[in-house]
């Protein structure tokens, strides 16, 4: 399953999101959701404990001036990569 988080993690039910995530799922952080990938942040630690792969949309990171603050452990993807993730997964759940 591809999960997308497009709101600030402070405005999302992260606990509920984690409950429905399964091994092998991907989470793509978009729009204000990219703030969840800030190095040393509370939400990054929580998300990295899940059995998922974590990505950020690079254009949204750049638009927010966060390029130097995103953790190196988080994959950075383009819109083309976003399409590839969509094709990879049979379903998508937006948060």
Curated annotation (Swiss-Prot):
The keyword Zinc does not apply. Gene3D superfamilies: DsrEFH-like. It holds the Pfam family DsrH. The keyword Cytoplasm applies. Keywords: Cytoplasm, tRNA processing. It is found in: Cytoplasm. One of its GO terms (biological process) is tRNA wobble position uridine thiolation. InterPro entries: DsrEFH-like (IPR027396), Sulphur_relay_TusB (IPR023526), Sulphur_relay_TusB/DsrH (IPR007215). GO terms for cellular component: sulfurtransferase complex. It comes from the Bacteria. PANTHER family: PROTEIN TUSB. Part of a sulfur-relay system required for 2-thiolation of 5-methylaminomethyl-2-thiouridine (mnm(5)s(2)U) at tRNA wobble positions. Heterohexamer, formed by a dimer of trimers. The hexameric TusBCD complex contains 2 copies each of TusB, TusC and TusD. The TusBCD complex interacts with TusE. Belongs to the DsrH/TusB family. This is Protein TusB. It comes from Klebsiella pneumoniae (strain 342). The lineage of its organism: Bacteria, Pseudomonadati, Pseudomonadota, Gammaproteobacteria, Enterobacterales. The gene is tusB.
């Amino acid at each position: 399953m591809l999960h997308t988080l497009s709101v600030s993690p402070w405005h999302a039910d992260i606990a509920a999101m984690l409950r429905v995530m399964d091994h092998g799922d991907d989470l793509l952080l978009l729009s204000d959701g990219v703030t969840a990938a800030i190095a040393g942040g509370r939400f990054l630690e929580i998300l990295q404990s899940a059995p998922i792969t974590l990505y950020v949309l690079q254009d949204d990171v750049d638009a927010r001036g966060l390029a130097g603050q995103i953790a190196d452990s988080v994959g950075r993807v383009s819109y083309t990569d976003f399409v590839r993730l969509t094709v990879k997964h049979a379903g998508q759940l937006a948060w």
